[in-house]
Structure formats: structure tokens, C-alpha cells
Amino acid sequence: MASTSAATPLKNKRKFENGKKKPKTLKDEFGEKLDIKPVIVPPKPADEYDYDSSDEEDLRNTIGNIPIKWYDDEDHIGYDKFGEKIAKPAKKGEIETFLEKMEDPDYWRKVFDKQTGTDVKLTDEQIEKIHNIATGKYPTIGYNPYEPFLDIFSSQKEIHPIDNRPEPKSRFIPSKDEMRMVSRMVHAIKMGWAKGPRAKKEEHKSYDLWASEDALDNVTKSQLSRMRVHMPAPKVALPTHAESYNPPEEYIFDDEERKKWEEAEKEDRVLNFMPSKYDALRKVPQYDKFITERFERCLDLYLAPRQRKMRIHADPTDLLPDLPNPNDLRPFPTTLAFYMRGHTGQVRAITVEPERGELLASGGEDGTVRIWMIATGRCIKTFQMDGEVTSVSFSPVADRTLLAVAYEGKYVAILNTGCGDRLHVQQTEALLAETPTDAQEDGAVVTWRKSKEKLMLKMPNEVRQVTWHSKGDYFASVAIDDIAKSVYVHQLSKAKSQCPFQKRKGHVQAVTFHPTQARLFVATKIHVREYDLARCVLVKKLITGCKHISTMATDANGENLFLGGLDRRFCWMDLQMGNKPWKKLKHHTAAVRSVAYHKKYPLLATVSDDGTAMVYYARIYTDFVKDNELYPVKRLRAHEKTPNDLCMLHTTWHPTQPWLITAGADGTIALFTY
């Protein structure tokens, strides 16, 4: 038992006697009291290394609450409590910052203190406050804005009442005190002592003579509701010269007018009175129809219904579309670079080499075809034709130096320009030599024959236009005359020609091939028809809205047609949207002679006989969500009018640069650059 009691720890029991707490007593293992006195332990001295700070790092900046940027140009950031300057700490380089970011685990919780120029490490409490502010919570840590609510009154409906005491008898017996009070009041009324409430004196309301009629200070709700739906009566017409007491002579009726006025019905009279003339105002008698007219006006105001007309007050400038800044739509041609002179007479057609755009071919009224260097503007070669040139077109194949020329005398010539890469020139010579012009059928309408460096096609009629297919083997020609067989399609590799149309559908003005498909667009005076050459069927008939089409062009994908007319109109046909124009513009004052769309840039140009070339920013979107964009950006002038009112006859774009080239009736070719 002794060992057991020795193993038991000392117990300290609390005993209370008479509500007082006894002091603690400790006993040993034999039950004897131990006398233990409290010992005062001195506090442990603070370790100087627990607070890791030096005198230099513990400086306090005493500049106060002023912008720290005032010290940007100084070599210090302020002053300490002794008035000494606090030097700026050395700035860390990018390498030191990167190493500290990688090696210091507490880098993310350090912020830069502008007052001391050092990084301060945030505590956990500060970080938690910042997190609460960033997440939209209360900055105070542990704050709960939604404390539990203690509902004092129970929401449960009880059957039994809380207090079930019976009602006292006094509740059912009339009160004697109230009876005595009522009897006193009755006696006072009988004796005349009790007096009722005094009547309030009505205040005198003075009428404000100068108040506005529209004032709403003392208006009732019913009056206000009537005022909202009130329609003011039309005002009486102002008097005219005929109602004057001394009107001019032309207002006085003669005998014929007087008789006509008297015989006319009252409703048919222009004036409901007969003008009179007096020498002085004092001689004017009383108006005999005054009461009648006022009565009729009262009837009109009372019986005639009124109608409220809503007028839209809109600023005309708000109805105009918002146009972008032309500087944001660059590049586009703005400046005349130089002229190319050499033709005598009109320059009717021009075309540019399709690959690099180094060469330009032009055909004129003087019967010459000239090859120009675009970079220098010099003529490097000239071909003399037997008639006036009406159309020229470079072959779209890059490795061929072929040029199709239509000129008067019912001829179409395929020339080898002999300019450019020597290998391409030799390949073109071999191609022309291999063309089977001898294997022609007897009685052919179009005859092919070779003549030195060119192929000659004898046409049945004068040719207006010649154009190539994108693959370079087929080209089409259009006759000037209004006949059924005005369009011919020629195949260069087989030296054959055929007329795809046997019936006359209208006077054909221009044709062009689809860039990617075997289709042909044929433009008459007012319509454009799209034919499928593979199936020989009509695909679509377009209603252009032009009275007389003069030119036609397509974009690189063949999904849009651009038309110009002699009626000064320019039409943009979006083939995916329907058979009607998407845009119709009339920016020219004379006939539109040519339209061209750039292959690389969203640029469109039209030239006219008014001596101007309109440059448009024409953005075509393949996405059906976005609509096409068309903005006029520049109007160019370079040519002079001739006596027959002709000016700009043709235009084309450089294939790789935003340069515009125009041909004029004054015998010059103009190049516009940006």
C-alpha cells in the first residue's frame, strides 16, 4: 500500500467553509503538511538575436506625409530623427531580382516601401486582410456580418394559451367612474357650459396676377390629368394683304371677278369676303360677318376632332453614316507620279503584266501597241497594226509573253512581246510555232493564220473587246455590232473558235470569264447573264439597274461583279446575295468608261469622261456575318477633255503595288502612286 500511495501524485483539494475559499495545503506521503513558500522567478533577459534588425535598417524617415517622388532627383530619400540624410539603397539588377525570386520562399509576400526604399515582409495577418479585400470580404479577420439570429417569438402556432386565467367580473360590469364622467358632461351641455371647437378662420387668398398660366402650384390631380391630354386649338390665320382697309389695286375685284365670286358656292370661294378699299381707317365700318365667323370657329373647335402629330426632331448629321478616317485605310494611290507619252490620239486600252507588273501594254487610236517599263515610264517596244487598236490584254500565264490585241479591220492578233525573261520569250515562240493553224475546217467563220511573230484571227465583225481565261488557253472576243453571233470563244492550243450563243439576247457590251470556274459573264445594256460553259446552260440573270452598261470586272474569287454605265452609275453585284445590286453609286458627272479591282489590296477604281478617277476602299468578306465595306477615299485627276467630251477611257491596277494606271483620250498614260 505504501508503494501504491507513493506512486500516487499529491492532490490539491478545494474546500469551502462558510462561503470562503481555504488556502491550498500540500501533504507528503505520510500525511504531514508541507510548508512551501512561493519563489519569485526573475524574467528571462531578451535575446538580442531574436529581433533581427540593425541600426541602419531601423531608420525612420521623418519627411512626413509628402510625395516621395520629390526625392527622385536627390541622392537620399529623406532624413532620420537626428536630421541626417537617409541614403538611397542600391537598386537591384535584373539578375539579382530573378535569383531572389527563385531562391527566397518569402519573395511573394514582400512589398516595396517607398519611405525607406527597402522591401517589407508582410505578416500573415496583413496578407489575410489583403486577401479579404481582394475577394470582396470584410478586412477584419474573423468578422461575421451574419450573426445567428435568435427568434424571441416562436413561429409555431400553439393550440393552448400561455395564460388561461378566467376573465374578471369587472370586464362585464359597466364602470361607475365612466358613468359619473358622462353625467357631468351631460349636465355641462345642458347648462351651456360646454363649448364646441372653434371654427378656423379662412385665410384670404390673393390672386397672383403675374403668375404663369402654366404654373402647377395649385393644380389638382384631375386638372393635371386633363392638362396632360390637352391639345391646343389651332391659331387663327394671320391677316393678308387682301384684308387690309387699303389693299393694293390687284386685290380689288373687277366686275367679272365680282360676278364670278357671287355665283360661286360658299365652299368653292377662295376668299370668304370681298376686299374693300377706304381712304382712311376711320371710314371703315363695322365688319358685318364678325359674329358669324366667331360662331363658326367655335363650332369648329367644339365639333371638329383634333389629332396630335408627332414630329421627330433629328439632326441631319446624325442620319449620315459614320465613315472611317481615310488615313486608317491606307495604302491607296494619292499622287500623280509621271506621264507616259508616245501615242498620237486616244489611248483606248491598257494592260499590265500579271506576275511582277514590270511591263505595261497600251493600244491607241494611232494603230500602235506600245510596251512600257513601269519603273521608268520608257517605251521599249512598238508594234504597228493595220488599224486602230480597240483592246489589249496580257496572257494571265506568267511564263508566257503573249498579248492579245483587237484592232479595226476585223482582226484579233496574238503577239509575242519579246520582252522580259529570255526563257519565257523562247517558250512563247515555240508555243506559237506549234499552234495548228493549218488544221482548220472549210467554211470556218473565224480563220487562223500565222504571220511572223504573231497569230492573226480574221473575225466576221469588228471587235470591241478581247479577254483571257485565267488558265491562258481560252480567250473571248466581243463584236461591236448588235448581232446574234457577237461573242466568240477561242482556244489557242487547237486554233479553234466557236460561238456559244446562237440567239440574240441583247446588244452585248462586255464579257469576262469567271476566275476559278468554267463560266462566262455576258453583259448587255441592262442585264448580266452568267453561263456555265461546261453544261451550256444559263446559271443566273442579274438585274443591274444601269440603263447602259459600258464596262465589267470581277474580283479574284468571282463572287462579286463591278459594273459601270454610260448613265454615270457604278454598281456592285454580290452574287451570293441575289440578282440585284448590293450598292449603286453615282459619284461621276459623266459616263463611266472602266472599272478595275485590285488582286492584292481591297481597292477599287472607276474612271469617267468627267476627267476623274474615283478610288474606293472595297473590303470583301467571305464570312456571311460581316457585310462588305465600300468607302470612297480619293478622287484623282490627270487627263484633259477632248472636243468630243472624252477623257479617261481605261484603267488598271498594278498587280503587286497599290498603283493605279489610267489611259486618256489626250494620248497620255498616267501612273498614280501613294
From Swiss-Prot:
Compartment list: Nucleus, Nucleolus; Nucleus, Nucleoplasm
GO BP: any one term: maturation of 5.8S rRNA from tricistronic rRNA transcript (SSU-rRNA, 5.8S rRNA, LSU-rRNA)
One of the record's GO cellular component terms: nucleoplasm
One Pfam family cited in the UniProt record for this chain: BOP1NT
Recorded superkingdom: Eukaryota
Basic and acidic residues biased stretches: 15-28
Cross-referenced PROSITE patterns: WD_REPEATS_2, WD_REPEATS_REGION
Major site of localization recorded for this protein: nucleus
Residue ranges of WD repeats: 342-384, 386-425, 427-458, 459-500, 503-541, 587-626, 643-674
Positions of the UniProt region annotated as Disordered: 1-28
Keywords tagged on the record: Nucleus, Repeat, Ribosome biogenesis, rRNA processing, WD repeat
Single annotated GO MF: ribonucleoprotein complex binding
Family matches, as SMART domains: BOP1NT, WD40
Signal peptide extent: none
Family: Belongs to the WD repeat BOP1/ERB1 family.
Function noted in UniProt: Required for maturation of ribosomal RNAs and formation of the large ribosomal subunit.
Protein name as annotated: Ribosome biogenesis protein BOP1 homolog
Species the sequence originates in: Caenorhabditis elegans
